[in-house]
Swiss-Prot record:
GO terms for cellular component: mRNA cleavage stimulating factor complex; nucleoplasm
Disulfide bridge positions per record: none
Role description: One of the multiple factors required for polyadenylation and 3'-end cleavage of mammalian pre-mRNAs. May be responsible for the interaction of CSTF with other factors to form a stable complex on the pre-mRNA.
Keywords: mRNA processing, Nucleus, Repeat, WD repeat
Start-end of each WD repeat: 106-145, 171-210, 215-254, 260-301, 303-343, 395-431
Subunit structure: Homodimer. The CSTF complex is composed of CSTF1 (50 kDa subunit), CSTF2 (64 kDa subunit) and CSTF3 (77 kDa subunit). Interacts (via repeats WD) directly with CSTF3. Interacts (via repeat WD6) with BARD1. Interacts with ERCC6.
Pfam families membership: CSTF1_dimer (PF16699), WD40 (PF00400)
UniProt name for this protein: Cleavage stimulation factor subunit 1
């Protein structure tokens, strides 16, 4: 049978695939030995691509492997991370250091929470002053691009029509601790230290107060809407997770007390298809739950070596969980095996982390972003290889308590104890 000539580049590609497979399977020391021997030109990410290619070759003839290597559908299109196939995907999206501040809004107290709407058009921020602001991303970009002389000559009416803050909501009597946009309706949910969950209808310009609320027994720490919008997960200072029907306010909890955390819940998030949700807690555990039965499927004990879990979110394809902890480390977990595939280290080198913050994906899941508490800068890693990228100085005058990235565009919001929220964006050359 005719065989194509194998060149040096082919062998280098083979060695990279072997290293990636060893890393994926957990043979770190063997992989490092091979890396030291081969010295590949680029960083190898954990990947199962070699196994898939071998299976294709065994199922078909020996030309199938060569065919699969060049096949477009074996490479992720850049819309999300998938380590089974995309070890060699070239990242096209901008890294964090290329973003710039486009707009700054101020509260009258520390700003510690923000959230994006599903379409990326709106951002809500919450503060210790008990207020909530809703901002329009397009207006923020337009405002930042507007010449000073044009801005100075705006009438009061024009300024109001073009102002990025489209709503300011007041109905809590203590710090706003968590926010979530309804997936389909113009409704914003908020949780607070005043023990209430409130629902605001922001479709009405005159609306300042909530139209519904739920009285909780503890301070709320994290909320997440079911993708249908009919239910909302609530994590509080109490270790028992709640699920509410937002129409009837009926509360559901797992029928097995052993499913619950043993300390306050810091993070709750649904996956896109709603068949799972994930929680992180001060008890150091990450729990994966069945979205239908409300039962705990699995628990990752001491997920961050016993440190408090600050955040846990799903990747777009629901194959992975990205978590962060007070050990200043971000981790990528494979759900099917419960293993840590990638660790993102280097934040928090100047001192122990005191406050909670979040690790987030950028909109293409090419990068992981995590604020460094002491230096007030943003750490950035390649999501597949954990290669450190350039730091971004965040320009705040106090600790950054929250970061949220747009689900659709190269933009993110940072919230700080300096009372400010900064909107960052990477403009293209055509903007």
């Amino acid at each position: 049978m005719y065989r194509t000539k194998v060149g040096l580049k082919d062998r280098q590609q083979l060695y990279k695939l072997i290293i990636s497979q060893l890393l994926y399977d957990g043979y770190i020391s063997i992989a490092n030995g091979l890396i030291n021997e081969i010295k590949p030109q680029s960083v190898c990410a954990p990947s199962e691509q070699l196994l898939h290619l071998i299976k294709l070759g065994m199922e078909n003839d020996d030309t199938a492997v060569q065919y699969a290597i060049g096949r477009s559908d074996t490479v992720a299109p850049g819309t999300g991370i998938d380590l089974e196939f995309d070890a060699d995907v070239q990242t096209m999206s901008p890294e964090a250091s290329e973003y710039e501040t486009c707009y700054v809004t101020s509260h009258k107290g520390p700003c510690r929470v923000a959230t994006y709407s599903r379409d990326g058009q709106l951002i809500a921020t919450g503060s210790a002053d008990a207020s909530i602001k809703i901002l329009d991303t397009e207006r923020m970009l337009a405002k930042s691009a507007m010449p000073i002389e044009v801005m100075m000559n705006e009438t009061a009416q024009q300024n109001m029509e073009n102002h990025p803050v489209i709503r300011t909501l007041y109905d809590h009597v203590d710090e706003v601790t968590c926010l979530a946009f309804h997936p389909t309706e113009q409704i914003l949910a908020s949780g607070s230290r005043d023990y209430t969950l409130k629902l605001f209808d922001y479709s009405k310009p005159s609306a300042k107060r909530a139209f519904k609320y739920i009285q909780e027994a503890e301070m709320l720490r994290s909320i997440s809407f079911h993708p249908s919008g009919d239910f909302i997960l609530v994590g509080t200072q109490h270790p028992t997770l709640r699920l509410y029907d937002i129409n009837t306010f009926q509360c559901f909890v797992s029928c097995n007390p052993q499913d619950q955390h043993t300390d306050a819940i810091c993070s709750v998030n649904y996956n896109p298809s709603a068949n799972m949700y994930v929680t992180g807690s001060k008890d150091g555990c990450i729990k994966l739950w069945d979205g239908v039965s409300n039962r705990c499927i699995t628990t990752f004990e001491k997920a961050h070596d016993g440190a408090e879990v600050c955040s846990a979110i799903f990747s777009k394809n629901s194959k992975y969980i990205l978590s962060s902890g007070k050990d200043s480390v971000a981790k990528l977990w494979e759900i099917s095996t419960g293993r840590t595939l990638v660790r993102y280290t280097g934040a928090g080198l100047s001192g122990r982390q005191v406050h909670r913050t979040q690790a987030v994906f950028n909109h293409t899941e090419d990068y992981i972003l995590l604020p460094d508490e002491r230096t007030i800068s943003l750490c950035c890693w390649d999501s597949r290889t954990a290669e450190r990228r350039n730091l971004l100085s965040l320009g705040h005058n106090n600790i950054v308590r929250c970061i949220v990235h747009s689900p659709t565009n190269p933009g993110f919001m940072t919230c700080s104890d300096d009372f400010r929220a900064r909107f960052w964006y990477r403009r293209s050359t055509t903007d």
